[in-house]
Amino acid sequence: NNFVLSQFLGICPFLGVSKKVETAAGMGGAVVFVITIASFITSLLYNFLLLPNDLVYLNTIVFILVIAALVQFVEMVLKKMMPALYQSLGVYLPLITTNCAVLGVALLSVQNNYGVLASTVNGIGASLGFLLAIVLMAGIREKLENCNIPSVLKGTPIVLVTAGLMAIAFCGFGGVSF
């Protein structure tokens, strides 16, 4: 299941940054990096530090600190290497720290008792799902700008209707097994 469309994790950047495909891809790439690395590091910390020392009650705080450090790293790299993308992401880049998708993936991995490898693979899958959803939404929104939409649905309403239709489409994948 797609974390954005089925569990509504990370909906703020999904709706806010999905106006242009390039910006959405940049945000998706940043989220892929942060979620993947955060899943690995938080799983290591949980399984080898917090759990053995009976410090499980600190997992949310520790996870947020790990995520914040990773986001700072991404922010520095983007500012130095890709200043145009850094500017276009604006306030949404530092908000990855509080993006519930990033924290949610880490917490769900712990809740499901995933090991380090399973947690990392879960992070990769979840983040690629986020990337796919945000890029698809951006592509649809770019096409919608050329459409004659009733004034009642212009702006946020049509975006929410589109997100709902995407969620229905992604739910169809839930019954597909390989």
Question: Model-derived features: where do they sit?
Answer:
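Structural signature of hydrophobic alpha-helical transmembrane segments
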Residues: 2-6, 54-69, 121-133
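Generic transmembrane alpha-helix signature in multi-pass membrane proteins
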Residues: 8-12, 16, 75-81, 90-93, ...
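C-terminal ends of transmembrane helices
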Residues: 9-23, 71-85, 137-148
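Hydrophobic core segments of alpha-helical transmembrane domains in multi-pass membrane transport
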Residues: 13, 31, 36, 40, ...
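Cytoplasmic-side transmembrane-helix entry/capping segments in multi-pass membrane proteins
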Residues: 23-34, 57-63, 85-97, 152-158
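Ordered, amphipathic secondary-structure segments that act as subunit-interaction surfaces
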Residues: 47-90
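Interfacial loop-to-helix junctions that mark the boundaries of transmembrane helices
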Residues: 48-62, 117, 121-125, 150-155, ...
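Interfacial loop-to-transmembrane junctions
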Residues: 142-160
